[in-house]
Amino acid sequence: MAIPMPTRQLFIDGEWREPILKKRIPIVNPATEEVIGDIPAATTEDVDVAVNAARRALSRNKGKDWAKAPGAVRAKYLRAIAAKVNERKTDLAKLEALDCGKPLDEAVWDMDDVAGCFEFYADLAEGLDAKQKAPVSLPMESFKSYVLKQPLGVVGLITPWNYPLLMAVWKVAPSLAAGCTAILKPSELASVTCLELADICREVGLPPGVLNVLTGFGSEAGAPLASHPGVDKIAFTGSFATGSKVMTAAAQLVKPVSMELGGKSPLIVFDDVDLDKAAEWALFGCFWTNGQICSATSRLLVHESIASEFIEKLVKWSKNIKISDPMEEGCRLGPVVSKGQYEKILKFISTAKSEGATILHGGSRPEHLEKGFFIEPTIITDVTTSMQIWREEVFGPVLCVKTFASEDEAIELANDSHYGLGAAVISNDTERCDRISEAFEAGIVWINCSQPCFTQAPWGGVKRSGFGRELGEWGLDNYLSVKQVTLYTSNDPWGWYKSPN
């Protein structure tokens, strides 16, 4: 059952504020192409106000209200937010499905992870105080040294539309746990649940200015946030092209950044596997979240001895995927997020065909859906490594298949990419899986599966997929600075210079 879209303003300094220029952006339901609401559009002027609010929150009461408060104080707020997310889970999931086209079952799963992420970082916030003043072993007895971990300050968090609330919370939860104050700028294509997070923060009494939520276009809100002198760090998830612009802006002030960018991840299937199990993982690894996954294993490498039979199974499994309005029960593939993305993906498929690839299955709009940005699950064969479809991130339900003859060839093909976010191998040979895991040029490796993600484990890439790690203890470290404190403990003078006495 549908749910009305709330009408919200920007969330700044603990209250709703109309954008200074009073601009708004329509919300389009990607399943129907209908306008179902709107969101506020922040501009440079609003960014200034939000940054000032975050800086005040950081230093209020000499930092004792937030940045220097005991970790248990921050943990209390994070747990309260988690409880409210659980309370509102059904409505949040429905809003997410309407806003970005994610199947409702997936959106519900995401909300469970959102609450779990806040709870996990509440525990880490609580444990942070006990880790302060960690001693450092020194070679000289006349000195003692210890380490302080302190919040970086005001952080700008720029997040994508494929996991609108979850990937925002991957940044919000650890940054607040660390004692930072934050300005969240979600994608203009899917911001609704991030504004609902702001409402939850208001409900639980989060101190004003600790979290500010600015919706709007990247050029009008994201860019001024990245370059703002009052922001101490930028954490970004999005495309390589936009990420490089964010880095350039941050570099002018030597501002630290962490980047989770695009991917073109490989999945290698050997000839010793259960073909049906492997086929399901291959499709899940590419078609989950409507194919809009930065870590999607969209380059499938199949051992030549099983290729024909395996590809046949892929097609059979693909035909069994329910493509529908994401609110329908049992939907497993919804629409892509926008008309622009829809047209971009179809252009990728068209170019692949013109370059000589075979569109074995899918490649167009499903016949039973006249409206909405729907694309059939698409399987492409006869691909060469020089083709655009093999080398560039599509960000849609498009799986490319190549064969290999040997383990060495599979590794070479897998690593032949500018990207290095995820990689997967399916084989019953444990030693082979270990060898390939070490050989993969990627930040995340899956064995006999694809795409599972846990709050406790690090997430991030290498090469053009970015740097820095989110989630786990590594996610908290993203928002902490390390300070060395060294004490001279001897009563004797230092004695380097000759005393005038």
From Swiss-Prot:
Tissue-specific expression: Widely expressed.
List of residues binding Na(+): D99, L189
Chain segments annotated as coiled-coil in the UniProt record: none
Activity profile over pH: Optimum pH is 10.75 with 4-aminobutanal as substrate. Optimum pH is 10.5 with 3-aminopropanal as substrate.
Deletion consequences: No visible phenotype under normal growth conditions. Mutant seedlings exhibit increased sensitivity to salt stress. Mutant seedling exhibit increased sensitivity to drought stress.
Record-annotated active site: E260, C294
Keyword entries, A-Z: Chloroplast, Cytoplasm, Metal-binding, NAD, Oxidoreductase, Plastid, Sodium
Sites annotated Transition state stabilizer: N162
Entry binding sites for NAD(+): G238, S239, F240, A241, T242, G243, S244, K245, C294, E393
A biological process from GO: response to salt stress
E.C. designation(s): 1.2.1.-, 1.2.1.47, 1.2.1.19, 1.2.1.8
Pfam families cross-referenced by the UniProt entry: Aldedh (PF00171)
Top enzyme category: oxidoreductase
Domain of life (superkingdom): Eukaryota
Statement: the UniProt record of this protein carries the keyword Oxidoreductase: yes
Matches recorded under SUPFAM superfamilies: ALDH-like
GO molecular function: 3-aminopropanal dehydrogenase (NAD+) activity; 4-trimethylammoniobutyraldehyde dehydrogenase activity; aminobutyraldehyde dehydrogenase (NAD+) activity; betaine-aldehyde dehydrogenase (NAD+) activity; gamma-guanidinobutyraldehyde dehydrogenase (NAD+) activity; sodium ion binding
Its job: Dehydrogenase that catalyzes the oxidation of several aminoaldehydes. Metabolizes and detoxifies aldehyde products of polyamine degradation to non-toxic amino acids. Catalyzes the oxidation of 4-aminobutanal and 3-aminopropanal to 4-aminobutanoate and beta-alanine, respectively. Production of 4-aminobutinoate by ALDH10A8 may confer tolerance to salt stress. Catalyzes the oxidation of 4-(trimethylamino)butanal and 4-guanidinobutanal to 4-trimethylammoniobutanoate and 4-guanidinobutanoate, respectively. Involved in glycine betaine biosynthesis.
Subunit-level organization: Homodimer.
Family in the record: Belongs to the aldehyde dehydrogenase family.
Name of the protein described by the UniProt record: Aminoaldehyde dehydrogenase ALDH10A8, chloroplastic
Organism: Arabidopsis thaliana (Mouse-ear cress)
